[in-house]
């Protein structure tokens, strides 16, 4: 999981969601694309 100031979807399978006030990117195709805003 990457922690970044700005999270963006990196492919068509990436979804931006908000959990407990934190923006996250989850990806069903490439788990490598997981990101968290921090």
Swiss-Prot record:
InterPro entries membership: Ribosomal_bL36, Ribosomal_bL36_sp
Keywords: Ribonucleoprotein, Ribosomal protein
Domain of life: Bacteria
GO molecular function: structural constituent of ribosome
PROSITE patterns xref list: RIBOSOMAL_L36 (PS00828)
A Gene Ontology biological process term: translation
Cellular component GO terms, alphabetical: cytoplasm; ribonucleoprotein complex; ribosome
Family: Belongs to the bacterial ribosomal protein bL36 family.
Protein's name according to its UniProt entry: Large ribosomal subunit protein bL36
Name of the gene encoding the protein in the UniProt record: rpmJ
């Amino acid at each position: 999981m990457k922690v970044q100031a700005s999270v963006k979807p990196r492919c068509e399978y990436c979804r931006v969601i908000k959990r407990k006030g934190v923006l996250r990117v989850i990806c069903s195709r490439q788990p490598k694309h997981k990101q968290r805003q921090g």
